[in-house]
């Protein structure tokens, strides 16, 4: 079956953005630019970054303008487009608001104020549906998770807790989100809203933060620069979930590239959707039609 449209969802740091220690294949950027300029392709950035940091990355790395941005760890979806509109998708906000029973991040912070291990992050890192804290890196996250869940669930609030570590600052990080707010659920909501399905969607990522999508039924690509432990984990979890056929591990050598960053994205996209190979390797005219 000929592919008529593609929803291309990609993580930013160390996936689309070549900001890891591994080398980038120089020809990958040109191929990617050709691919995302096609009218058949809807480009979606999927990131933990907020709007300001996404815009900063777009300027710093000269990224193509996306059609949509899923940001703030899945709590926001923006329609962007060539006019850089940055219009929030209100339908997504309404979906995730149900989990917090009409409450905001400010309300939740008041409910958690007496927990000494939680230090609120700067206001620029918060939004209505994302409450972020600094946590001691040695903190027992299991017991703290139980306390937070018990406290909030008794108030009718259902949350997802996302733990990570800032290795530079040597501090723990915690994002308190609505239960259904995640990269995967946001992608699924956008698929439904835009009329895409599993036969014309792909996700590209590199790290543990992408794990939920990488092992889901959504066709997914792990770029070659992903850490070995991530590669082992994602293969194991995909096998357990029965989604091995929906996972592609980039290995390099595709079009004489190394599989890192954009090269890995292209390798995986062409694996799932061979029609796209012509989209980014054959020259096009100004109307984005293939030149004979």
What feature does the model see in each segment?
Residues 3-21, 214:
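Asp-based phosphoryl-transfer active-site loop
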Residues 10, 71, 205:
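Active-site flanking residues adjacent to catalytic metal/cofactor-binding acidic residues
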Residues 19-23, 46-48, 179:
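Short, flexible loop segments at the rims of nucleotide/cofactor-binding pockets, characterized by
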Residues 23-26, 225:
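A short acidic/small-residue loop/turn micro-motif
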Residues 26-123:
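Active-site phosphate-binding/coordination module
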Residues 109-202, 207-217:
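Conserved acidic, metal-coordinating active-site core of Asp-based
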């Amino acid at each position: 079956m000929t592919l008529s449209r593609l929803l291309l969802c990609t993580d930013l740091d160390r996936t689309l953005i070549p900001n890891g220690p591994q080398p980038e294949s120089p020809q990958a950027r040109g191929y990617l630019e050709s691919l995302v300029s096609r009218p058949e392709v809807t480009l979606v950035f999927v990131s933990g970054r907020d709007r300001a940091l996404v815009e900063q990355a777009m300027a710093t790395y000269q990224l193509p303008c996306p059609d949509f941005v899923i940001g703030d760890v899945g709590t926001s979806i923006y329609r962007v487009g060539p006019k850089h509109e940055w219009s929030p998708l209100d339908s997504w906000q309404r979906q995730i608001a149900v989990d917090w029973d009409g409450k905001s991040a400010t309300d939740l912070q008041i409910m958690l104020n007496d927990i000494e291990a939680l230090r609120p992050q700067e206001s620029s890192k918060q939004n209505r549906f994302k409450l972020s804290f600094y946590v001691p890196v040695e903190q027992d996250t299991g017991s703290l998770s139980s306390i937070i869940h018990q406290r909030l669930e008794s108030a009718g609030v259902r949350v997802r807790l996302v733990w990570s570590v800032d290795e530079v600052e040597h501090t723990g990080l915690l994002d308190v989100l609505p239960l259904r707010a995640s990269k995967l659920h946001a992608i699924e909501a956008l698929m439904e809203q835009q009329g895409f399905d599993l036969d014309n969607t792909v996700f590209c990522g590199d790290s543990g933060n992408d794990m939920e999508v990488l092992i889901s039924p959504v066709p997914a690509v792990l770029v070659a620069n992903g850490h070995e432990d991530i590669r082992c984990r994602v293969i194991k979890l995909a096998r357990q979930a029965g989604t091995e056929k929906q996972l592609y591990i980039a290995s390099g050598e595709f079009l004489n590239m190394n599989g890192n960053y954009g090269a890995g994205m292209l390798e995986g996209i062409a694996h799932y959707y061979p029609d796209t190979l012509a989209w980014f390797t054959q020259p096009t005219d100004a109307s984005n039609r293939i030149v004979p």
